[in-house]
Amino acid sequence: MGTILKGMSRVRWHELTHAYGSAVGVPGRLSRVAWGDARTSASALSDLGLWLGELAVFDATVETVPSLWDLAVTDSVTNRSGVIKLLQTILEHANPPEIEVQQAAHRAVLDGRSVADVLARDEDAAVRAAAGELVAAIDSHVCESCCPSA
């Protein structure tokens, strides 16, 4: 793997799950986002969205978020705005049976707030727009697992 996704090889993907089972396919999809053309990247992001965020969040989601932040700031990635939108999707979804997983996934997105601020000033208008929406979502984020009532 290249320098963009260098930390990905340390993750034990075969031990993690996503919405449809084993997460062994996640690194390949992340690589397609990193180095694929627009069509390949969009297809890979669609898969990642279904697997990691649209239905619920999973342990594989938690491990994927740092790579998504990495992709979002890499100019050579063809669909950075799509990556940013996936981060927002992850922040907006839950996994009630596994509150700790939900909290960790949300925290991984929330911890990238300063990166989202930088992206909100990006030269690419689509990246700026997606990042602006993500910043707003981060700033207004309240969920039971992240902000338990006292």
Regions found by a protein language model. Give the residues of each.
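Buried hydrophobic core positions in alpha-solenoid tandem helical repeats
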Residues: R29-L30, S67-W69, V115-D117
